[in-house]
Amino acid sequence: MSHRIVIVGGSGFIGTNLILFLLRQKDLEVFNIDINPPRLRSKGSHYHSIDICHLSSFYSCLLEISPDYIVHLAARTDLGGNSLDDYSANTLGVENLMKILPSLPNLKKIVITSSMLVCRTGYYPKNQFDYAPSTLYGESKVKTEEIVWHNSPQCDWAIIRPTSIWGPWFGVPYRNFFDMMMAHRYFHIGCKGCTKTYGYVGNAVYQIEQILFNDTRDENQKVFYIGDNPPTNIEDWANEIADELGYKVQRLSLIHI
């Protein structure tokens, strides 16, 4: 018996890769709900053009599909907003989703996507509810998580916080690093390299699939970071990329005045 999976926001970078990953498995029927058309027309997936901020159309679509599983990826993810209202997909869209869930009789599990930017860079949260955003986008994702916690689904559920995910079909801001490398415009600064948690999208969608199809009912372990381990040393990674491109990264020394 096949299972129906809805990817809300399946036309985006992670969503596109997740749909391709799921379609390689048997007994899965995949549906993409997104305001934007899919980047790839994949055999076996079904696209529905829906604005998740419009409750009635979102409700009708999900009710018609009657999914067994949902992965919610839809969001505004850039940092250019001037107010929280600019991130309505991350707030109102999630509120609408939570309103619809009780009407889905076959739903077994939902995974809702947040962001590591619910905490500023370098801040280590003490628990699942410890937030320290430094951007409006991060604040909007705090709202995402709070909406989910305050309207906990009756089925199993989990929240994921992707780190710096890269790979096929990715865009700003993480593509910028690769574009600078290919243009020979990246330089090592000073004598000390930093580390950052990146995640290859192929690994990320595998992690999402594992969370989706495994039990996460422990209320103390509802939030999962998506990314590769261990963290990546930026200098080492830049050197590896430069080697593949056939050149050597130059180092700029700091001048102390």
Role assignments for model-derived ranges:
Residues I5-Q25:
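N-terminal Rossmann NAD(P)H-binding glycine-rich loop of SDR-like oxidoreductase domains
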Residues C119-R120, A158-N176:
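Flexible, glycine-rich beta-alpha linker
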Residues I52-A89, G122-P125:
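NAD(P)H-binding glycine-rich loop region in Rossmannoid oxidoreductase-like domains
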Residues I70, G81-I110, I147:
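NAD(P)-cofactor binding segment of oxidoreductase domains
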Residues N214-I255:
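Mid/C-terminal beta-alpha module of Rossmann-like enzyme folds, strongest
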Residues E95-L136:
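Conserved Rossmann-fold NAD(P)-dependent oxidoreductase catalytic core, especially the SDR/UDP-sugar
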Residues S134-A158:
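Active-site Tyr-X1-5-Lys
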